[in-house]
Amino acid sequence: MRALRFLIENRNTVFFTLLVALVLSLYLLVYLFSHTPRPPYPEELKYIAIDEKGHEVSRALPNLNEHQDDEEIFLSVVIPSYNETGRILLMLTDAISFLKEKYGSRWEIVIVDDGSTDNTTQYCLKICKEQFKLNYEQFRIIKFSQNRGKGGAVRQGFLHIRGKYGLFADADGASKFSDVEKLIDAISKIETSSTDLKTTKPAVAIGSRAHMVNTEAVIKRSMIRNCLMYGFHTLVFIFGIRSIKDTQCGFKLFNRAAILKIFPYLHTEGWIFDVEILILAIRKRIQIEEIPISWHEVDGSKMALAIDSIKMAKDLVIIRMAYLLGIYRDNKKC
């Protein structure tokens, strides 16, 4: 009875103490599950390519900040790759054909080999040399000695590009590469709408498959896959990204101003990195345009559907709570 009387008489103090304990416990839990990008190993700060004489060379990667005024490269294409010898050729053929015709030599492809075990790097070097006849000016490979995750591969690639614009594109070629023109047009409109003539307005344009929700490409997916997809989209909506219908499309374009404001601050190295990119853009008031693109299903996904879907849901909660609690800060580089 004394204990009950004490609780009643001191209910405000008890409630406050329990609330503080709950918040501290939540903070500790989120902190323990939060992400910190792995620092790159020395060999991951170099790129592998073919020189003018056809020899394989390894050279230091450029730094993103060192090429802010480099207009020689209009578009950099970052392709995260993990065991992609069976799929990447079609994607590269489509991309390189378009890039040569549209931009001449003002482009580069940066493949980030995320610790592949199927000789993806050597395969890409071979087709670069023998089929595409490209050298280090336009075709570079960053090779990870250990798998970091798709987000880690994309982040590392974007931190070392030279282009005015940077495109992240999946290696499977599911997206029609020429649709990059739609994304560039969208960003150009954002840039020209700015009244500040001294600086470029940060802008992001993302490919979207939302318009295909009732098409054969989506309907033919398994019921489990579609249920997980709708469940994930609902969770993303609940956790605050309500203006974007398709957060996971592997076809996203950024101008250099947006790249500098997003990628050095990106924590997540797993599948959910797309969502953190958009969260950072929204928090930093960077304009995002969602553009419908052509897309088709390609076999050979590296995603373990059930396990990775659960992990993505967990990581989504962690990301949102980490920003809310101040564990992640959008003004502190990782």
Curated annotation (Swiss-Prot):
Q: Which residues lie on this side of the membrane: Cytoplasmic?
A: 34-334
For the null mutant, the annotation states: Leads to a loss of UDP-glucose:dolichyl-phosphate glucosyltransferase activity and a concomitant underglycosylation of carboxypeptidase Y.
- CDD domains noted in UniProt: DPG_synthase
Q: What class of enzyme is it?
A: transferase
> What UniProt keywords are attached to this protein's entry?
Endoplasmic reticulum, Glycosyltransferase, Membrane, Signal-anchor, Transferase, Transmembrane, Transmembrane helix
Q: Which GO terms describe its biological process?
A: protein N-linked glycosylation
Keyword Transcription included in the entry's annotation: no
According to the record, the segments passing through the membrane are: 13-33
Q: So which domain of life are we looking at?
A: Eukaryota
| Matches recorded under SUPFAM superfamilies | Nucleotide-diphospho-sugar transferases
UniProt catalytic activity: a di-trans,poly-cis-dolichyl phosphate + UDP-alpha-D-glucose = a di-trans,poly-cis-dolichyl beta-D-glucosyl phosphate + UDP
Residue spans, topological domain Lumenal: 1-12
Q: What is its EC number?
A: 2.4.1.117
Q: In which pathway does it act?
A: Protein modification; protein glycosylation
What Gene Ontology terms describe where this protein resides (cellular component)? endoplasmic reticulum membrane
Membrane topology per the entry is: Single-pass membrane protein
> What GO MF annotations does this protein's record show?
dolichyl-phosphate beta-glucosyltransferase activity
The remark listed among the other comments is:
Present with 5800 molecules/cell in log phase SD medium.
Q: Which family does it belong to?
A: Belongs to the glycosyltransferase 2 family.
Q: What does this protein do?
A: Endoplasmic reticulum membrane-bound UDP-glucose:dolichyl-phosphate glucosyltransferase involved in protein N-linked glycosylation.
Which protein are we looking at? Dolichyl-phosphate beta-glucosyltransferase
Give the source species.
Saccharomyces cerevisiae (strain ATCC 204508 / S288c)
Quote the gene name from the UniProt entry. Answer: ALG5
